[in-house]
């Protein structure tokens, strides 16, 4: 277990023998770090926090610190990070709160670029990319394979659907539909299916075409959401992707970006 002599590690921390703790890192009590995970330097981790295997965490990242929530009064909440994530410089990841299940979670194989912020009770899936300066407010849920462009802000309690792409500098205050591409400055607009991303992930071209047609009905046909759903159910084959899209929309509490 290579731990740099300048690192400070609480005796209760559970660190795998193959993990690497770099210079000037601080590892607090009740922290677990899995095999082959590396903390480069100046990384600060508070517990209760679990970090899985083969993660790389870059300098000046903070993990598991208290949330920026005035209702938080020191309750025992935790942070869970999966495996094979790359967490770049100055990323901030906050623990959960009583209002959100007491846990913040990050899945596997994500890339969190510099200065990204993961607030309390966020649930980030797997294979996601958060570009520089992305800010996820409390209770945000990000589906697998989502890509969020630089300096985008996501309002609390919003959901970003799986396989979606959000353009840089966007301000997202409603749910973003799965499989879609959304770009905004202040007024958000959906520009259709995330065709390029779906092709790269091996989706069938016919399935992508059905998604494109469904999103066109939702965003460009001058229909309200209920009318668009009726048209989709009547006119477009009920593929698994279409079922996921409709289930996401029908479960939205904030409305969806159109």
Task: List the predicted regions and their residue ranges.
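Terminal amphipathic alpha-helical/low-complexity segments used for targeting or macromolecular assembly
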Residues: 1-6, 11-12, 17-18, 54, ...
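Structural signal for interior beta-strand "rungs" in well-ordered beta-sheet cores
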Residues: 2-187
């Amino acid at each position: 277990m290579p731990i740099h002599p300048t690192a400070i590690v609480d005796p209760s921390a559970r660190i795998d023998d193959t993990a690497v703790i770099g210079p000037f890192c601080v590892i607090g009590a009740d922290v677990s770090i899995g095999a082959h995970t590396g903390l480069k330097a100046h990384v600060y981790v508070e517990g209760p926090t679990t970090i899985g295997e083969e993660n790389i965490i870059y300098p000046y990242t903070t993990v598991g610190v208290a949330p920026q929530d005035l209702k938080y009064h020191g309750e025992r909440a935790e942070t869970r990070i999966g495996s094979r994530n790359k967490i770049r410089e100055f990323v901030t990841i906050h623990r959960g709160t009583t209002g959100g299940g007491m846990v913040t979670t990050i899945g596997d194989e994500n890339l969190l670029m510099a200065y990204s912020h993961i607030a309390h009770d966020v649930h980030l899936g797997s294979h996601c990319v958060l570009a520089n300066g992305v800010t996820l407010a409390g209770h945000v849920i990000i589906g697998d394979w989502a890509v969020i462009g630089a300096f985008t802000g996501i309002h609390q309690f919003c959901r970003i659907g799986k396989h979606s792409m959000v353009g840089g500098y966007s301000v997202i205050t409603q749910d973003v539909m799965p499989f879609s591409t959304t770009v905004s400055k202040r007024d958000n607009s959906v520009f259709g299916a995330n065709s390029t991303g779906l092709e790269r992930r091996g989706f069938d071209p016919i399935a992508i075409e059905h998604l494109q047609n469904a999103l066109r009905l939702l965003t460009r046909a001058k229909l309200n959401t209920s009318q668009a759903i009726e048209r989709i159910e009547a006119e477009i084959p009920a593929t698994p992707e279409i079922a996921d899209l409709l289930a996401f929309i029908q479960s939205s509490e904030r409305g969806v970006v159109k």
